[in-house]
Amino acid sequence: MILSNGEPIKCTHSEPLAIYISGGITGVKNWKDIFMAAEQDLILHLHARFFIFNPVKIAKDLERSFKVNIGRMPSYTDYMREDIKILAMCNAICMLPGWKRSKGARLEYRIAKILNMQILEWQPN
């Protein structure tokens, strides 16, 4: 279930809620499955106008672009720059379990706080 300060999420924005999913990737064996499960849970439980930005899909698009235009895979820095650019367009972030162990997720959390985004926490059922 998705939580925000212990309460179910409510869309309080007049505009659609854009949610960026954040969590550990480096060193997490099944990170793609975790991110996809969180996205599916958001889709199933939130009955409002939402856009969900999932780093699994962002990474695929970035890798495709790099292969075609640059001829190499993106670096960690390249992934983070793309993720931060997309995060900055959102008005909410959904933190996955274990995010505090991830340098990138901690940075994304700090950016979300600075940009006054709604911060959500996701726990699998």
Language-model segments: residues:
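Conserved catalytic or regulatory cores that recognize and/or transform ribose-phosphate-containing ligands
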Residues: 1-125
